[in-house]
């Protein structure tokens, strides 16, 4: 369904772009659609009213049609800003068809090198980023004029413009892309200097720059939305004329809508946490005396991946497998003997419940029955979703990861020498990304065939995202694992060079991080590529999990010893946003930022 609206502010970039017509979506030629259309008036006094009107429309209670609209390329800068705003506020899914139409038209204008895109630095950078992420073939060479700081007049551009260039530079998908590499170097240096010298008087803009610079690729989707909502200031930014052809949803209304949407998702996340805790208790996992209890962590990570209430089964399946994989990994590492660890693998291969006395220990019984009952339940649900049985696949994924756990256990306990390649050839599976993604993907609303799941593309997606998470994890757990005599990629890099020019720990860590970056870019290449066997909706899951790895292991081990995560968990799962009536957001003496019919 489509929602038409008016905006007269750019709530984040602060960069003012005037549009002569401001129609949204954009089409050079007339477009006629019979899709339902809702007009949300500024007379709405609460976000609840606004959400109610939108829900009524989505439920088909309003029957109108969108008239033919003729737009011009001059509207593109304004429309791209609106898309960026919708994405940052986390409500772009309600406007996906309009966004797709705009980006289709923007790509056509990009190919024609229209002045409306290429003459403004902010628009140029934003168009490049939005198009590349969507999968359009856009060359970074078009940004070459901005690649060298010496060629950019910093007296004529502001911090928000540099932010857009910085964000564009983050979409480098190949090591050879010197344009984006150079663009990243100078924009990141410039923005860091702005922070160090306190040169950004706007507090919210200062916080935004700091947030981007800390860990850009570790910004989890919903945490980014929460931060954007916190930094949204309807009274600060200059007005933007927009959307005469659309109805009157003012900037304050959009904020109220986005905040209400966030709170609805948050309530769902709290409900899912209760379901996880109940499942955890039912499985008797809370009685285990060893290992990590990551129920709240898994709920946070899956909630941060996606806020769509309709994807609850995806999040729950993913979270349950984070918990199960972690518990069994800890059992293999510390909780049980080698023989007991082998026993779990044998039980999963056999896939048959036994009398309690035949498991050998209560811990083995609890772990196996937790996997057995959870997988059987998910298999039944997935059968309905997929229209076919996927139980064998789910069991196979468990046999695979447990077999790798066994190999790693044997390797480190027997003190077997490994090369880095030998280690990575199996350890990317044991990080758990593959099993969590492929099982939860069954509930994404996409029919997954054997051809898709057994394809080289699927293997590459799984391997690249897992390599990122594995390598970054190794960097942060290197010291702990060295003390436990369980090597990882960093220790293997050090060992590999002992007969050559010796490298120190810092150099080994840098090499591991570089290898993680290489795999992250390879993952982006597959995800952004169009016409592949997996639809984009599926491939996006791999990118989301990649961000989880970057989030968890950028400066510590947030998974095992969460610190920043505890604060983020509060804001994402527990602390709702306070929503004020739209009128209350108006600044005294300033006209309401709405356009009337």
UniProtKB/Swiss-Prot annotation:
The EC number(s) given in the record are 4.2.3.131
Ordered alphabetically, the record's keywords are: Chloroplast, Lyase, Magnesium, Metal-binding, Plastid, Transit peptide
Residues at which Mg(2+) 3 binds: 473, 481
Single GO cellular component term = chloroplast
Cross-referenced Pfam families = Terpene_synth, Terpene_synth_C
Q: Which Gene3D superfamilies match?
A: Farnesyl Diphosphate Synthase, Terpene synthase, N-terminal domain
Family indicated by similarity = Belongs to the terpene synthase family.
User: What role does it play?
Assistant: Involved in the biosynthesis of ent-kaurene diterpenoids natural products such as oridonin, miltiradiene, eriocalyxin B and nezukol, known to exhibit antitumor, anti-inflammatory and antibacterial activities. Catalyzes the conversion of (+)-copalyl diphosphate ((+)-CPP) to miltiradiene.
The answer to whether UniProt assigns keyword Transcription to this entry is no
The protein's annotated catalytic reaction(s) are:
(+)-copalyl diphosphate = miltiradiene + diphosphate
Query: What organism does the UniProt record list as the source?
Result: Isodon japonicus
> What name is this protein filed under?
Miltiradiene synthase KSL2, chloroplastic
Q: Which PANTHER family match?
A: CIS-ABIENOL SYNTHASE, CHLOROPLASTIC, ENT-COPALYL DIPHOSPHATE SYNTHASE, CHLOROPLASTIC
A single GO BP annotation from the record? terpenoid biosynthetic process
Q: In which pathway does it act?
A: Secondary metabolite biosynthesis; terpenoid biosynthesis
Spell out the subcellular localization from the entry.
Plastid, Chloroplast
Main EC class the enzyme belongs to: lyase
Q: Give residues annotated as binding Mg(2+) 2.
A: 329, 333
Q: Where is this motif: DDXXD motif?
A: 329-333
Q: Which residues form the signal peptide?
A: none
